[in-house]
Design a protein with these regions (language model features):
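Conserved alpha-helical scaffold segments that buttress catalytic/binding sites
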Residues: 1-62, 68-76, 80-81, 89, ...
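A short helix->loop->beta-strand "cap" motif at the edges of active sites that frequently abuts
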Residues: 97-103
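Glycine-/small-residue-rich active-site loops that bind phosphorylated ligands and cofactors
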Residues: 36, 111-112
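Solvent-exposed polar/charged
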Residues: 53, 96-97
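Alpha-helix-loop-beta-strand connector modules within alpha/beta enzyme cores
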Residues: 84-96
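Short, electropositive alpha-helical surface patch
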Residues: 80-81, 113-129
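Short active-site-adjacent structural elements
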Residues: 69-72, 102, 112-116
Length: 129
């Protein structure tokens, strides 16, 4: 997600990682405004996927927000539906590897309706493979 210093609601800092007995189970990876598909996917592969290797989840729950799309008026990331497709492909692969294919996706944000439709279509097509 985008750096919380630059967007609403101002939460999701790296140090916000849970509390009490679940401290450390929430991971936030804020990205600077203007982040491209290439940079986002590079970060995803190098920093996020290794977390799955360590955690080995029983199932994967995706909060599928598409407001990072370059055409979306809310965020200032420069992602495209192709980036969302690649992330979904990787998440599906992780679900197959660790969670016996168990993956649930819940729609969250996306406020440019055409960009949202393209992103959701890419996401669902990849989930169904």
């Amino acid at each position: 997600h985008q750096d919380p210093r630059t967007c609403y609601p101002g939460t999701g800092f790296t140090q916000e990682n849970g509390f009490g007995s679940v401290k450390g189970f929430t991971l936030n990876f804020p990205m600077p405004p203007g982040t491209s598909d290439e940079k986002y996917l590079e970060f995803f592969h190098n920093r996020i996927i290794p977390q799955f290797e360590e955690f080995k989840p029983d199932f994967i729950l995706l909060s599928a927000g598409f407001d990072g799309h370059v055409r979306d008026p809310l965020a200032m990331l420069n992602l495209t539906e192709n980036c969302y497709r690649e992330i979904t492909k990787d998440m599906r692969t992780l679900a197959e590897k660790f969670a016996n294919g168990r993956i649930v996706s819940l729609l969250e944000g996306g406020y440019d309706l055409e960009a949202l439709a393209l992103s959701v279509e890419s996401h669902i097509q990849e989930l169904l493979k």
